[in-house]
Amino acid sequence: VDRLVGSEMCIRDSSHTVDYGFDDGQWTILENGDRIWRILISSPGAISLNFIFDDFYMPKGGSLYLYSDDKSDLLGAYTSVQNQDSGMLGTWLVYGEKVWLEYYEPAEVIGEGRLHLSNITHGYRNPKKKQQKDLNESYDCNHDVDCDIGDDWAAQKDHNKKSIALVLMNNSLCSGALINDTSNSGTPYILTADHCMDSSDAITAAYLFGWISPITSCATYSNSQSGPMGMTVSGSTLRASDPDSDLSLIHI
């Protein structure tokens, strides 16, 4: 892969409408007939880049990876699992001002994949920068998840930690939480705010999970640190919303 050379596209706005597809970038045919398409997206000074595809379809065996030019940050593989009826997909952040898009297509499905990039967001703030939280920085209503509030809390707190998500809609961030339904079906519903998104935002939203605090003791006298910025999911459907209560129910 290091020997492959792609085309470089340069953007400069914070959120930019683009028109990039397989006619851009570069194809490389492998010895077994499989092929790889690559394109390098450059946005000078960007802390991160994230992407919206308005035509996304991965055939069986096809996969898409996004990674920084220095290979320190990686998203993927995006596969047929991420195919949606809308044909759209939004990604999480890739850190760096240069990001490679790399699509792999097996010989038996040549020409079946579709990939069209319609929007690129130039990130100018780093959500990872302030990982250290000062003592007494939280509000009174914020409960330390590692402090027990009942006999059964120890069994529940890890589930609560894992349910919290950051929600990325193009160039804005919100928070949300996984909730269950009354039939305990395990359907992945996210509860977030109505002001965060509409139906089109939900289609291209990306979700970050894995907010598990490395500090597991209650009320320590040292600063706390956020968990890893990993484990992302892309694509969802707006199931219900209510502006009066500022509620949105999302199915991921």
Question: What are the residue ranges of the model-derived segments?
Answer:
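Short, surface-exposed beta-strand/strand-loop-strand elements in extracellular ectodomains
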Residues: 59-72
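Single conserved hydrophobic/aromatic residue that forms the stacking wall/gate
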Residues: 1-6, 11, 250-251
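Extended, low-complexity, turn-rich repeat/linker tracts enriched in Gly/Pro/Ser/Thr and Asp/Glu
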Residues: 56-62, 198-199
